UniProtKB/Swiss-Prot annotation:
This is Small ribosomal subunit protein uS5. Part of the 30S ribosomal subunit. Contacts proteins S4 and S8. Disulfide bonds: none annotated. It comes from Vesicomyosocius okutanii subsp. Calyptogena okutanii (strain HA). It comes from the Bacteria. SUPFAM superfamilies: dsRNA-binding domain-like (SSF54768), Ribosomal protein S5 domain 2-like (SSF54211). GO terms for cellular component: small ribosomal subunit. With S4 and S12 plays an important role in translational accuracy. Located at the back of the 30S subunit body where it stabilizes the conformation of the head with respect to the body. Belongs to the universal ribosomal protein uS5 family. The gene is rpsE. GO terms for molecular function: rRNA binding; structural constituent of ribosome. Residues 14-77 form the S5 DRBM domain.
Length: 171
């Protein structure tokens, strides 16, 4: 049952993507209790993204719990013209994620769970690669942490007391 599944629903102006559903088992004295775990990514397509996991005895309930958690955990991502400001490397557990801005017309070149996060946040041109593990939860966490750790040139300039042109080297 483990694997990559995608569901595009636009609800309340949010893009909701179902990344993974797993059947989980709890072994007790009287036998086995089956349940389901869901991983969902929610974004507005304009620089906000969140992810959540939910567990329940039935699939729809697990998905709904995950979507509620994802909506509550939304974070801002600074984007420029549908891509990133600069290259990012992010690690979570064994997952190592590399993301690099791309020129217009490149598209989203990323695999599996990373693609869901990038499409939900509103990135249209990017080159991305995941190394180390293919665990969807770790890959989604690493991708979101990398995107949210990125700082815009305006923020860096104000922190340093400089202008954006001085930061980017255009002066």
């Amino acid at each position: 049952m483990a694997g990559y599944k995608e569901n595009n629903n636009i609800d309340n102006n949010y893009i909701e993507k179902l990344v993974n559903i797993r059947r989980v088992v709890k072994v007790v004295k009287g036998g086995r209790i089956f349940g389901f775990s869901a991983l969902v990514v929610v974004g507005d397509g304009n620089g906000k993204v969140g992810y959540g996991t939910g567990k329940a005895r039935e699939v729809p309930v697990a998905i709904q719990k995950a979507m509620d958690k994802a909506r509550k955990a939304m974070k801002n991502v600074p984007l420029v013209n549908g891509t990133l400001h600069y290259s990012i490397i992010s690690n979570v557990g064994a997952a190592k994620v590399y993301m690099q801005p791309a020129s217009e017309g490149t598209g989203v070149i990323a695999g599996g769970p990373m693609r869901s996060v990038l499409e939900a946040v509103g990135v249209h041109n990017i080159l991305a690669k995941c190394n180390g593990t293919r665990n969807p939860i770790s890959v989604v966490r690493a991708t979101v942490e990398g995107l949210t750790s990125m700082l815009s040139p305006q923020l860096v300039a104000t922190k340093r007391g400089m202008t954006v042109d001085q930061i980017t080297g255009e002066e």
